[in-house]
């Protein structure tokens, strides 16, 4: 069982939210994030369920096992941008910050995959690093120091092995903490 609080199945929704103007994007990963962004922009209060246990079954050909390429990160970012711009009146001057949070989250997932090639030189990655500099203090509340270190290291191709080493150590540390907690 896994504890999931940020995904669609970790919340209770009013049916009326689904009868409003929800858009459905043809994306193979992250559809739940887009749904939550749309609902979050419509609903002033959201209540989280502290723990959600579910039997996780993964089937062959599952999107979770699909390779995540940099093009997908860009495509997903564009879909999120479309939703946040659509609700600009609610977000105000926080729009760019929320876009950066989304881009960083997906790019960090991409970075941690050892089979993914270096993408630190792409316009997408360079843009994230440039924007992160403007919000350095605020990002500390959302991303660990190690996450931010991965982004800084990824600016240089020759540091790709270091990025993978740090991300592996982070994964092992997280796994060890989880095992010791039980």
Predicted regions and their residues:
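Catalytic core of nucleotide-sugar-dependent glycosyltransferases
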Residues: 52-59, 65-91, 106-135
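Residues within HEAT/ARM-like alpha-solenoid scaffolds
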Residues: 75, 94-102
